[in-house]
Amino acid sequence: MTRSLKKNPFVAKHLLRKIEKLNTKAEKEIIRTWSRASTIIPTMIGHTIAIHNGREHLPVYIIDLMVGHKLGEFSPTINFRGHAKNDNRSRR
């Protein structure tokens, strides 16, 4: 179920403060965050945000096509290594 249009998109307050601070300075820094549930808003465009995937922070450059999506969508948490091979020699 999608979020109601009457409500504003969720963005963590600490993340929003950091982005507004960088926008006033006009500097580009990598912002580290654990807030995967935050929605990408237009003020984030052009910034690089390092999103935590449970083990490390993955840097993601925010572009205009990402607006409206959640930060966690761009930081995969599971690394699928494939199914086990069917090795007939090990069965003998």
From Swiss-Prot:
<keyword id="KW-0934">Plastid</keyword>
<keyword id="KW-0689">Ribosomal protein</keyword>
<keyword id="KW-0699">rRNA-binding</keyword>
<dbReference type="GO" id="GO:0019843">
    <property type="term" value="F:rRNA binding"/>
</dbReference>
<dbReference type="GO" id="GO:0006412">
    <property type="term" value="P:translation"/>
</dbReference>
<dbReference type="InterPro" id="IPR023575">
    <property type="entry name" value="Ribosomal_uS19_SF"/>
</dbReference>
<dbReference type="InterPro" id="IPR020934">
    <property type="entry name" value="Ribosomal_uS19_CS"/>
</dbReference>
<dbReference type="GO" id="GO:0009507">
    <property type="term" value="C:chloroplast"/>
</dbReference>
<keyword id="KW-0694">RNA-binding</keyword>
<dbReference type="GO" id="GO:0005763">
    <property type="term" value="C:mitochondrial small ribosomal subunit"/>
</dbReference>
<dbReference type="GO" id="GO:0003735">
    <property type="term" value="F:structural constituent of ribosome"/>
</dbReference>
<dbReference type="InterPro" id="IPR005732">
    <property type="entry name" value="Ribosomal_uS19_bac-type"/>
</dbReference>
<comment type="similarity">
    <text>Belongs to the universal ribosomal protein uS19 family.</text>
</comment>
<dbReference type="Pfam" id="PF00203">
    <property type="entry name" value="Ribosomal_S19"/>
</dbReference>
<comment type="function">
    <text>Protein S19 forms a complex with S13 that binds strongly to the 16S ribosomal RNA.</text>
</comment>
<keyword id="KW-0687">Ribonucleoprotein</keyword>
<dbReference type="InterPro" id="IPR002222">
    <property type="entry name" value="Ribosomal_uS19"/>
</dbReference>
<keyword id="KW-0150">Chloroplast</keyword>
<protein>
    <recommendedName>
        <fullName>Small ribosomal subunit protein uS19c</fullName>
    </recommendedName>
</protein>
<dbReference type="GO" id="GO:0000028">
    <property type="term" value="P:ribosomal small subunit assembly"/>
</dbReference>
